[in-house]
Structures are given as C-alpha cells and as structure tokens.
Amino acid sequence: MRILKSHPLLKLLNAYIIDHSQPTNINYLWNFGSLLGLCLGIQIITGVTLAMHYNPSVAEAFNSVEHIMRDVNNGWLIRYLHSNTASAFFFLVYLHIGRGFYYGSYRSPRTLAWILGVIILILMMGIGFLGYVLPYGQMSLWGATVITNLISAIPWIGQDIVEFIWGGFSVNNATLNRFFALHFVLPFVLAALVIMHLIAVHETAGASNPLGTPAYYDRIPFAPYYLFKDLITIFLFMFGLSIFVFFMPNVLGDSENYIMANPMQTPAAIVPEWYLLPFYAILRSIPNKLLGVIAMFASLVILMVLPKTDLGITKGLQFRPLSKIAFYLFVTNFLLLLQLGAKHVESPFIEFGQISTALYFAYYLIIMPGVSILENTLIDLSQKG
C-alpha cells in the first residue's frame, strides 16, 4: 500500500478509487459513473482495433467493414461490441443526466461538473455521428449529407463551410478521411474531459447523496465498499451487453446501412441513430431551416441554464411533489420526442413534434422556475402558519 501513496501517478489512483470518502447513503443510481468509464474504455480499445483494419475511402470503406466481419479473427465481435456499447454509452448517459436532474446535481457547488458533463454530451453526439458515417452504407452517406447540410443554414458563409467540411461538392474520399481522423482523435479529447469532470466533482464537494444534504461526516472510503457495489452493476451491465452483442447485434441499427452507399438512390426515410432522435425531432418540428438548427443546438446548451432556473429552496426533487410531477412529465415528453424523431414528416407527427418541442423548452424556462417559486411560497406560508 505504501507505493500507492508515494508514486506520483498511483497516488492519484489511490485518491480517487481507494481512499476517497463517499456518503454512506448513496444508492445504485450513483453507479453510472463507473459504468460510463467502462463504456469509454471499451469504445477506445475496440475503436483502435477496428481502425487497424478500416480503409477510409469511398471505394473501400464498406468492403473494409465486411473484411473485418468475415476475415479478421473475432472481427465481428469487435465491431458489434463497438456499435452496441455506443448505444449503451448513450443510454447510461441519459440515465446519469436524469439522476442529476432528479437529485439536483447541477446546483452549487457542483455547477462546474454539470457544465463539463453537458460539454461531454455534445462531444459524444458529434463523435457518434462521425462514427455512423464510417461504414459508408446508405444511411451513412445520406445521414452525413443531411446533417452536414444543416450548416448551410448559416447566412452567407454556410454553403462554403459545408463544402470545406466535405472537401468537395458532395460527400467523397476527403470527407471520409476527415471524419475518420476526427472519430479516432476526439475520444481521447473526451477522455480528457471525463478526467476534468471527475476532478470537478471530487475537488468541490465530492459525490452528492439522495437526501441532498451536505454529507461531510457520515462517510466511508470508496474501497472496498463502493468498489464491490460498482462491480455488481458492472457484471450486470456486461451480461446485458453480451445479450445484445451475441443474440441481437443489429436490433438498434438500421437495415439500410447494410446496403452499400449509392449517391443516386435516396432511402425512403433518413433516420439517425436512436440516441440522436429527440434532438432530430426538435430540428424537424420547426419549418424554418436556420431556426430548426438553432433550436436543435439550443436544446443541448439549455441544460447549462438549469442551475439558474431551479429556484427551489431545497436541493433535488425528492421532497418537492409538484417538481416531481413536472419532472416525470418532462421525461415522458422526452421519450415522445424520441419516438417522433423516427416518424415520417407528416401530420399528425409534425403537430405533436411542435407541441413536444415547446414543452421541452418550457420546462427549463417556465415550468421549473414557476413550480419552484410556487413551492417556495407554500413552504413560507406553512412556516408562518
């Protein structure tokens, strides 16, 4: 144990994973951090391995993926691990954010950790989109064309930026090379942001707890107590991931992507990966192209205003019944947006999308501060009574 406390690198590991004290009352909702770290590790290892066999060219990208699947030893396993862990990564991130919403993890002194977390989410979406383009199937090509074309909504310079990103007048070899290079490098930037996120949590007030109260006294070391608690969910997660990888590896993908990219034939519906669907629904719900793009980016950036719009006296929603109802309605609305993002742009889905988009933004800007003020008023009245 002495080397753990004297070695310059190992003592950091010791401070964060062994000796760091945690509140005694945190539950399994606090296990998402370790699972997300595991997902990031799997993605980097499998991604680097896949990069050794991938060829980023219009002529060979699709064939190189087939080569990985058929000819590389356990290539099918590496590829399916990479694609399914990406979905698991986003699923766990959404749960992690939901826990942060419910227990007020965005409030001081953890505001910096929350803002870094939002930046991580935005970067993850960019990395996920870049990766979706690389197999160069039908959905890869047309997804890349549609999403990059959104930048053309920027007045005057938009089209020039799009052509600069493409390296030509359409998606071509230069585009694939750029996307591959960025998709390879950005996960390491993501890992650096994750370390910053961890430092922001640990150097401010440490982990929060379900009561939302400062837990400076009733604490226990991370190892062995929470280390074994994390291992339980890690084993359960690996079991669940294995079911997807071995028995239904393509259930979360799109069958169109098993057709080689054809610039002369547009798919019946251009749908991104499931984890981008809520924001795609917000984009499509606004008829104006520029306003739709602004709304889509605003729907992510608006997460950063939560520390200012939650005006409640108490931290978290566990003792605030009206805020709980508003939160569950928000979650339902988010799941509805996820469904609407996969639908065709036709009535009644357009109208439902517009209502859901309005409710999404209203939760942050109107419902949350309004309900907080109402609850504060009721608390004041009960104290005076």
Swiss-Prot record:
Keyword entries, A-Z: Electron transport, Heme, Iron, Membrane, Metal-binding, Mitochondrion, Mitochondrion inner membrane, Respiratory chain, Transmembrane, Transmembrane helix, Transport, Ubiquinone
Cellular component terms per the entry's GO annotation: mitochondrial inner membrane; respiratory chain complex III
Ligand binding (heme b b562): 82, 183
Binding site for a ubiquinone: 202
GO molecular function, one term: ubiquinol-cytochrome-c reductase activity
The organism's place on the tree of life at top rank: Eukaryota
Parts of the chain that traverse the membrane: 32-52, 76-98, 113-133, 179-199, 226-246, 290-310, 322-342, 349-369
InterPro entries linked: Cyt_b/b6_C (IPR005798), Cyt_b/b6_C_sf (IPR036150), Cyt_b/b6_N (IPR005797), Cytb/b6-like_sf (IPR027387), Cytochrome_b (IPR030689), Cytochrome_b_C_euk/bac (IPR048260), Cytochrome_b_N_euk/bac (IPR048259), Di-haem_cyt_TM (IPR016174)
GO biological process: mitochondrial electron transport, ubiquinol to cytochrome c
Keyword Transmembrane helix attributed: yes
A Pfam family annotated for this UniProt entry: Cytochrom_B_C
Function according to Swiss-Prot or TrEMBL: Component of the ubiquinol-cytochrome c reductase complex (complex III or cytochrome b-c1 complex) that is part of the mitochondrial respiratory chain. The b-c1 complex mediates electron transfer from ubiquinol to cytochrome c. Contributes to the generation of a proton gradient across the mitochondrial membrane that is then used for ATP synthesis.
Subunit structure: Fungal cytochrome b-c1 complex contains 10 subunits; 3 respiratory subunits, 2 core proteins and 5 low-molecular weight proteins. Cytochrome b-c1 complex is a homodimer.
Protein name according to UniProt: Cytochrome b
Gene: cob
